Design a protein with these regions (language model features):
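One-carbon transfer enzymes
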Residues: 1-162
Length: 162
């Protein structure tokens, strides 16, 4: 993934964990790593693993996901990647977009932070729509939402230190 190249170029440590060893061992290893590194915010982009309630409850309001639709449309278990855009086109909707939400135990069911709409063109394919939603919505709302939540985290830490 290009994120690993970016991390290396920026001198940021990176680790790759895969859920191939099973959900529980994956989540346990991830939790240990996040705590060791004192991570305050987890961003999910293109992450297709559904995290367990046990994991998400350890990180309340600290996991953000970007989903390629305007939730509650075209979301939930099994709705990711091109499937979302195929469903939007099959349904004939005129507008789709992206949603950033907090992650909880319900797939795509957490509190919505930001949404951005993208019009669907008559000649769109799932691939062209996916690209436009990424460029016009996902890549814009995820950094904005992360910035807002980071500011909230900083305020909380400052209040604890006062």
């Amino acid at each position: 993934a290009y994120a690993l190249t970016r991390a290396e170029n920026a001198g940021v440590a990176a680790r790759v964990l895969t859920p191939s060893c099973g959900q529980e061992p994956f989540e346990n290893e991830l939790s240990v790593l996040l705590r060791e590194q004192e991570i305050d915010l987890i961003l999910l982009a293109g992450f297709t693993v559904i995290l367990s309630a046990e994991f998400t409850k350890q990180w309340p309001r600290r996991i953000l996901n970007v989903h390629p639709s305007l939730i509650p449309a075209f979301c939930g278990k099994g709705m990711y990647g091109l499937r979302v855009h195929e469903a939007a086109l099959a349904r004939g909707v005129k507008v789709t977009g992206a949603t950033v939400h907090f992650v909880n135990e319900i797939p795509d069911g957490g509190e919505i932070l930001l949404q951005k709409a993208v019009e669907i063109a008559p000649d769109d394919t799932p691939e062209t729509l996916q690209r436009r939603v990424m460029e016009q919505a996902e890549w814009q709302v995820l950094p904005l939402a992360a910035e807002r939540v980071c500011a909230e985290i900083v305020r909380e830490k400052e209040q604890k230190n006062d």
